[in-house]
Amino acid sequence: MSKFVFVTGGVVSSIGKGIVAASLGRLLKSRHYSVSILKLDPYINVDPGTMSPFQHGEVFVTEDGAETDLDLGHYERFTDTSMSRLNSVTTGSIYQAVINKERRGAYMGGTVQVIPHITNEIKERILRVAQNTNPDVVITEIGGTVGDIESLPFLEAIRQFRKEVGRHNVIYMHVTLIPWIPAAKEMKTKPTQHSVKELRSIGIQPDILVCRCDRPLHPGMKEKLSEFCDVPVESVITCQDASSIYEVPLILEKEGLAHQTLELLRMENRSPDLSQWQSLVEKMQSPHHDITVALVGKYVQLSDAYLSVVEALGHAAIASDSKLHLRWISAEEIEAQGAATFLKDVDGVLVPGGFGIRGVDGKVQAIEYARENQLPFLGLCLGMQCSVIEWARNVAKLPEANSAEFETETPNPVINLLPEQQDVVDLGGTMRLGLYPCRIAPDTLAFSLYQKEVVYERHRHRYEFNNSYRTQFTDTGFVVSGTSPDGRLVEIVEYPHHPFFIACQFHPEFHSRPNQAHPLFSGFINAVLKRRNAPAKIAVNCHTVTEDHEPS
């Protein structure tokens, strides 16, 4: 039978529960325990698929096509384990399931209530994760902050859960904040005391406290927290701020988090093997090169909107012994001031996914600049579609080319709606989602990176390359290097007469791992590094001249 760890958060939101849950998962896996991590989100949306990136951050897509919270990306990257739609639960999905059951008569005419019907559905979802893959430990993160009205059904459900599966099969872990008060020149435990008091008022006594702080907790502070929160002093864990999230598992291992967890669950505390993770962190902390990459997007004011892209770039930078300087550039500002203003001193350009017409022309201009100036370029999803539009307008002599998403009456719809999307009305959960195969053409950049004939990547899109223009593109030098197995759907495009110019319809960032960077990102960063270390080249009327590269 699986054991269960429930992670709650107190004092403030964005306390880092997801990183703590993911780090615990890594520590347990280092002891050869299997782990699955579940996120319970208190918002009433069925999933985050239709939410604004400014409100929610990125939508992380699982292999089975679920649109989920970005924390699932942390879970996958830290544990190197793929999650599924079972690992993401929202209040909206719970209520939807209960109401559907009521409509079918499943409750035999009874009054449907939060207790027991909503709480039973929540418990059923937790058990479903355990039954699906039978992991040794299921870690469940409860979204929101203790005290929020939205979280109450989830907290009540996990309170009941312990009684039903056995006391020694469940522990409660509370992540909280110990703030430093500059005026008093001391750390304060009172917010944590009140947070634990709130948790205890609904029947949950935390077994472990994970204390977020910007400096070490001294022993006296731990003893105080132990006394007032009724937690053994050895279960008061310091989680001090770190320069990278990948340091957190090592910090928590040193503090004894995994040891305390296993002891409370009556599991063997096996010897951990964190040597690879330690090497990863050491390599990240001592880079030999500096590179600058421009990320040209629509939602650059909120970095979480592109979280997996940033992480994937970081993984590739670590692998190449490089320190990545990421320059966030608004596509709309490029429209106003021109691409050269922002891109003249970067080493590479990445255009990520997105939706809507705002900023599209700026992305197209950025891609044109990268192509003409021999800047390494990587396009993802909408980034690929923009590269197709750029090529059509500037090389294939179709100046009015556009995507049907942005201009329904364009005379040259080089990007068109997928046929299966023609009659779709609802927005939520209706795109081409999840893992699909891609067949890669030999003797292409894509094949040199993947070294495979068929790869599987995650998708999230409604529009595709319009095959009516494929011959016109290939005749002008554009290469279709990856397609669906039947050859119909264009998955990867590239321009061979360029140091590195490749774009894909899928989202490779979702498959990148700290210890195994994705091939497309590795290739991109290696090309960026090669350019950085070589004499600069500037395009002049399709020819290149070499200049001395000024040190920076």
From Swiss-Prot:
Superkingdom of source: Bacteria
Binding site residues for CTP: 13, 148-150, 188-193, 224
Swiss-Prot/TrEMBL catalytic activity: UTP + L-glutamine + ATP + H2O = CTP + L-glutamate + ADP + phosphate + 2 H(+); L-glutamine + H2O = L-glutamate + NH4(+); UTP + NH4(+) + ATP = CTP + ADP + phosphate + 2 H(+)
InterPro entries: Class_I_gatase-like, CTP_synthase, CTP_synthase_N, GATASE, GATase1_CTP_Synthase, P-loop_NTPase
The protein's enzyme class: ligase
Enzyme Commission number(s): 6.3.4.2
Residue sites binding UTP per the record: 13, 188-193, 224
Keywords: ATP-binding, Glutamine amidotransferase, Ligase, Magnesium, Metal-binding, Nucleotide-binding, Pyrimidine biosynthesis
Start and end residues of each stretch annotated as Amidoligase domain: 1-267
Binding site for L-glutamine: 354, 382-385, 405, 462
Pathway this chain belongs to: Pyrimidine metabolism; CTP biosynthesis via de novo pathway; CTP from UDP: step 2/2
Activation and inhibition: Allosterically activated by GTP, when glutamine is the substrate; GTP has no effect on the reaction when ammonia is the substrate. The allosteric effector GTP functions by stabilizing the protein conformation that binds the tetrahedral intermediate(s) formed during glutamine hydrolysis. Inhibited by the product CTP, via allosteric rather than competitive inhibition.
Any one Gene Ontology molecular-function term assigned to this protein's record: CTP synthase activity
GO cellular component: cytosol
Residues where Mg(2+) binds: 71, 141
Sequence positions that bind ATP: 14-19, 71
Any one Gene Ontology BP term: 'de novo' CTP biosynthetic process
Active site: 381, 507, 509
Domain Glutamine amidotransferase type-1: 292-534
Miscellaneous section: CTPSs have evolved a hybrid strategy for distinguishing between UTP and CTP. The overlapping regions of the product feedback inhibitory and substrate sites recognize a common feature in both compounds, the triphosphate moiety. To differentiate isosteric substrate and product pyrimidine rings, an additional pocket far from the expected kinase/ligase catalytic site, specifically recognizes the cytosine and ribose portions of the product inhibitor.
Family: Belongs to the CTP synthase family.
Function: Catalyzes the ATP-dependent amination of UTP to CTP with either L-glutamine or ammonia as the source of nitrogen. Regulates intracellular CTP levels through interactions with the four ribonucleotide triphosphates.
Quaternary context: Homotetramer.
Protein name per Swiss-Prot or TrEMBL: CTP synthase
Organism, as annotated: Synechocystis sp. (strain ATCC 27184 / PCC 6803 / Kazusa)
